A protein has these predicted regions:
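Short acidic/histidine-centered micro-motifs embedded in hydrophobic/aromatic stretches
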Residues: 67-68, 101-104, 123
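Mid-chain, well-packed structural core segment of small domains
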Residues: 73-99
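Amphipathic, charged-and-aliphatic alpha-helical interface segments
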Residues: 62-77
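Alpha-helix C-capping/helix-to-loop hinge sites
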Residues: 50-54, 68-72, 88, 105-108
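Acidic, glycine/proline-rich low-complexity segments that act as flexible tails and inter-domain linkers
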Residues: 1-61, 90, 116-133
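C-terminal structural segments of small proteins and small subunits
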Residues: 108-117
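Alpha-helical scaffolds flanking conserved acidic
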Residues: 59-64, 95-100
Length: 133
């Protein structure tokens, strides 16, 4: 049976189950996306599940990394942080391990300083030079 011949709700449930099978859960975060575009979600599920089917990292480590990715200042996706904390705990992550992820990812924010501070120093020098001219 071709994909287009499968009723929407049936295909939606199959895709949710495929995600559950691959990742061990299906969070409500995905409901809106899967409801809007089944084809996109199907491709996302295939792509994002590759590390779950192959690779050297255990599931707990993968979930800890996912927490860091979702919590990073470049993403800050709180529903993802919550979903991956739940999964990490199910895989045996400790409070200390999860806290260490937050400590590690917080260092990303230092780039605001390392980018901004040299510009600030340059502008201070420029302002001083203009003042003296």
């Amino acid at each position: 049976m071709a994909t287009e011949d499968v009723p929407f709700e049936e295909r939606k449930e199959r895709l949710k189950e495929a995600f559950r099978t691959s990742r061990g859960y299906f969070d409500e975060v995905w409901d809106e996306i899967i409801g809007l575009d089944l084809d996109f979600f199907e491709q996302y599920e295939k792509f994002s599940s590759v590390p779950w089917h192959h690779g050297a990292l255990d599931p707990k480590t993968k979930e800890l990394i996912a927490i860091g990715l979702n919590a990073s200042v470049t993403h800050m996706y709180m529903p993802g942080v919550r979903a991956h904390i739940r999964q990490a705990l199910k895989f045996g992550a400790t409070r200390q391990e999860i806290m260490e992820v937050f400590q590690l990812v917080s260092v990303l924010g230092v780039h605001s300083l390392t980018v901004g501070l040299p510009i600030f120093v340059e502008e201070l020098k420029r302002a001083e030079h203009e003042k003296d001219s």
